[in-house]
């Protein structure tokens, strides 16, 4: 297993392009997560792709031959498909929407609500979805119980500029164009497609894996169903990694995956909690990464400090 210093990790993170800020993105943790992956494998499958931070990081290092991106949130997949396959189209259409806010009567905030209304009325183009994501608070996608995008705009900024977007998506396209499939299916359908030689990376939405509805998505994910799907991967000999629960200070959030799955749990240092800093406490957030059987055996022995809990800084 390759290891990196904290300074190297920061440098790697800065050099990996991203499309737009996205709450829950594993971009900052990608260098740590990739340390537990094989140097080469056939296909990377992301059933909960979001903005595909792990796929982008893996493709930059040319570790996989093919990539499969899936997310139940179809408009997000529309962004990824255009960014990778037709970046010229995405940049041109996004530029139109983004520049319109600068001259819109009533200002950029009013413009945001106009685009949001159009999106909810059916114009779920990649450019509209990307603009809403770039402008909304914390880059946090939120839907109502009826599937309406209901996040508010961040009034302090205009969102990712077309120039910055172009620089990043052309890089991303150069890594992934012609090597990637896109879908918006139930994650279990995607897992059925995995074969030995593939690596599945799963980052289920928040604690939607804990029987609760996650309002980034149109449906929640049942814990027992998820555990059953993971067990099925085990029985088929598929390599996989899961970003799942974690802790901040003394507080643990999320439910541990069952021990009978035979997974190794690693705690990755995600840095100081911004919320705790605001409250005058300096508490470190750790995010859990679960490794399947063969990935555990590939890990360098010096890193096997504990079977269930291991801090990686």
Please provide the spans of the model-predicted regions:
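SAM-dependent nucleic-acid methyltransferase catalytic core
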Residues: 2-32, 87-201, 205-213
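SAM cofactor-binding core of SAM-dependent methyltransferases
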Residues: 35, 40-117
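Short His-Asn-centered micro-motif
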Residues: 47-48, 70, 183-185, 202-204, ...
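Short, solvent-exposed loop/turn segments at secondary-structure junctions
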Residues: 51-54, 73-75, 135-138, 187-190, ...
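A short acidic (Asp/Glu
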Residues: 56-58, 79-81, 193-194, 210-214, ...
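Short, surface-exposed loop/helix-turn segments at secondary-structure junctions
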Residues: 213-221
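Long, positively charged, glycine-interspersed low-complexity recognition regions
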Residues: 220-313
């Amino acid at each position: 297993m390759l290891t990196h210093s904290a300074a190297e990790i920061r440098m790697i993170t800065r050099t990996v392009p991203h499309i737009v800020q996205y709450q829950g993105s594993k971009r900052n943790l990608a260098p740590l997560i990739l340390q537990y992956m094989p140097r080469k494998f056939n296909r990377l499958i992301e059933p909960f792709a979001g903005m595909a931070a792990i796929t982008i990081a893996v493709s930059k290092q040319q570790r996989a031959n093919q990539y499969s991106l899936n997310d139940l949130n179809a408009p997000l997949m529309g962004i990824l498909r255009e960014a990778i396959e037709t970046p010229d189209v995405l940049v041109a259409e996004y530029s139109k929407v983004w520049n319109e806010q600068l001259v819109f009567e009533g200002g950029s905030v009013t413009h945001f609500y106009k685009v949001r209304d159009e999106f909810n009325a059916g114009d779920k183009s990649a450019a509209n979805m990307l603009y809403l994501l770039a402008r909304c608070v914390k880059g946090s996608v939120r839907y109502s119980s009826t599937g309406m995008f209901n996040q508010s705009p961040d009034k302090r900024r205009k969102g990712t500029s077309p120039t910055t977007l172009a620089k990043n998506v052309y890089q991303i396209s150069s890594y992934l164009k012609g090597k990637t499939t896109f879908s918006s299916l139930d994650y279990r359908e995607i897992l059925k497609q995995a074969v030995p030689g593939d690596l599945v990376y799963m980052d289920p939405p928040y604690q939607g894996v804990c029987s609760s509805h996650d309002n980034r998505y149109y449906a929640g994910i049942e814990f027992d169903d998820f555990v059953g799907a993971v067990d099925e991967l085990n029985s088929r000999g598929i390599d996989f990694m899961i970003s799942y629960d974690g802790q901040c200070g003394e507080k643990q959030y999320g439910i541990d995956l069952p021990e009978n799955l035979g997974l190794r749990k690693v705690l990755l240092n995600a840095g100081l909690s911004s919320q705790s800093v605001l409250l005058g406490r300096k508490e470190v957030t750790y995010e859990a990464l679960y490794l399947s059987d063969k990935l555990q055996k590939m890990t360098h022995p010096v890193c096997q400090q504990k079977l269930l809990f291991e801090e990686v800084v």
